[in-house]
Amino acid sequence: MARENKKELIGRVVSDKMSKTIVVEIVQRKMHPIYHKYLKVSKKVKAHDEKEVSKVGDKVKIIEVRPISKDKRWSLVEVLEKLK
């Protein structure tokens, strides 16, 4: 049975130096459990960019896919906003 509920994330491209691979930084706001203050938490993930359309600074949407390599478990869906 195929799993249809795949995670989608939106983030900024911070590196496109690898062939068909981009590094996307995802920034989320999480509340501290004791101090109840919102903190910015970021993580970087590698995503597959088959057509190499995204550049550094672009806002992109990525989706969870089967493992492509040791580090890649995400794939580019679309470029939401190009950097000018």
Swiss-Prot record:
Keyword RNA-binding recorded: yes
Keywords of this entry: Ribonucleoprotein, Ribosomal protein, RNA-binding, rRNA-binding
Molecular function terms, GO-annotated: rRNA binding; structural constituent of ribosome
A single BP term in Gene Ontology: translation
Annotated SUPFAM superfamilies: Nucleic acid-binding proteins
GO cellular component, one term: cytosolic small ribosomal subunit
Coiled coil: none
UniProt entry tagged with the keyword Signal: no
Subunit (UniProt): Part of the 30S ribosomal subunit.
Known role: One of the primary rRNA binding proteins, it binds specifically to the 5'-end of 16S ribosomal RNA.
Entry's family note: Belongs to the universal ribosomal protein uS17 family.
Protein name listed in UniProt: Small ribosomal subunit protein uS17
Organism: Borreliella afzelii (strain PKo)
